[in-house]
Amino acid sequence: MKKKILLIQPENREINNFRKKQFNNFVQITIPYLAAFIDEGQYKITLVDEYNQKIPFNIAFDLIAITVNTPNAYHCYDISRIFRVKGAKVVLGGPHVTLLPEEAKNHCDYLIIGEGENTWPQFLQDFYNGNAVERYVSITPPVLKNLPVPRWDLLKHRTAIMKGAVFATRGCPYHCRYCNLKQIYHDCFRTRPKDEVIHEIMQLKSRYFVFWDDNFFSDKPYAIDLMKNLAPLNKKWAAQVTLVDCADDELLKAAKSSGCLYLFIGLESFSDVSLIDAGKQINRVADYQKIIQNIHKYKIMVQAGIIFGFDTDTAKVFENTLQACEQLGIDGATVSILTPLPKTPIYDQMKEEGRLTADNWSYFNGKTGVAYIPKNMTPQQLYNGYVDFRKKFYSLPSFIKRIRVSKTRIPYNFIMNLGYRLAIRKPARHSERKLFPFQMVL
């Protein structure tokens, strides 16, 4: 007899309204990917992406699987509690569970810790047979070969341009102090067989997709070969890369030829001192203009990742950053407040210094609150400066200044900027919730 399984992609309620209005939003790959490992002879599968679907609490399931990120951890625990009261078993996995399994175990029946290619299928078989254990831990790095194609057919698609997603590589060679990637994945960079990646891309119904890689250009020969094989498919895509790799004309030429629309690049700051604080010395502000001009030369847009709130940032950082973005022709910006995620060097430093102000993970989303005491401004100044920067950056005058420099994919560029502009008109924050939780974490 088949067991009924529900896989949930939870959405951070603090920023869901903001994300829905972004035209360049893209789908999450996790639950369609996990669903592909499930034997439909043993399980009846239901997928729910909370971004655009409601969780069916009124339906009985045997097993609930939830992927947990730090900002939505408490929300996931609430979902788990409701289903467990109804008699369902709950398995939790994802970044937050991997980082804090001792916390997560109090809110579920089973844990998947670390990468799941080996442990998830084993758990599913054990659960079906009635002998599942509490913890499944990834001991060795999974070989990313012969992986199943994500079950996009089971998912209600988001209203977005980028309706497809695939990953070709896993890992990143760098050690940024705010990033918890090294604590989530095995510390080794891996690639998938190129023919398997191309086959998976061919299965995507949408022409537009995103590479869900942490650093797509890390292995140059692999990336170039993959892009050469991608070119005949006439797809349009985006990926996350590092700035230094974009000085390479061979990579950019292959990206343009294979349909690259934009590259997400973590600039993080326009201050070399702040970049040192971030542990991102691979970026040099003196290189920004030349490399960004090089990217634009190949008609590829730049979506810059920018973080406010490093210890060397002052109240002047917002206006200085805006001027720099306009001078460089930055096409789009994904802007965040520095978030001391658990197990990162920045989290450990701030905890030791007594500067963490929240013990509720919902404050750790980088968008709607400040979870620590900044060094050179108040939390209110940091938040207000962040909000003001986004409004100014996505204003029409700023767009005109930037597009005059960029001159890249103007229609798409305008649509992308308009989407962000509509999204930031009203801060996505619950009225009953304090913005700055001044409860010191010991």
Where do the model's predicted regions map?
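Acidic, low-complexity intrinsically disordered segments
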Residues: 2-208
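A structural motif corresponding to the C-terminal end of an alpha-helix
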Residues: 38-44, 291-302, 328, 392
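Radical SAM enzyme core and accessory elements
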Residues: 3-7, 40, 44-47, 62, ...
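Structured beta->alpha junctions
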Residues: 68, 72, 96, 112, ...
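Structural detector of well-ordered beta-strand residues that form the stable sheet scaffold
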Residues: 91-92, 112, 135-136, 238-240, ...
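Flexible glycine/acidic-rich beta-alpha junction loops that bind and position SAM and/or redox cofactors
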Residues: 12-16, 103, 221, 273-278, ...
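Structural recognition of alpha->loop->beta junctions
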Residues: 103-121, 254-264, 320-335
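Radical SAM [4Fe-4S] cluster-binding motif and immediate context
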Residues: 148-303, 308-310, 316-319, 323
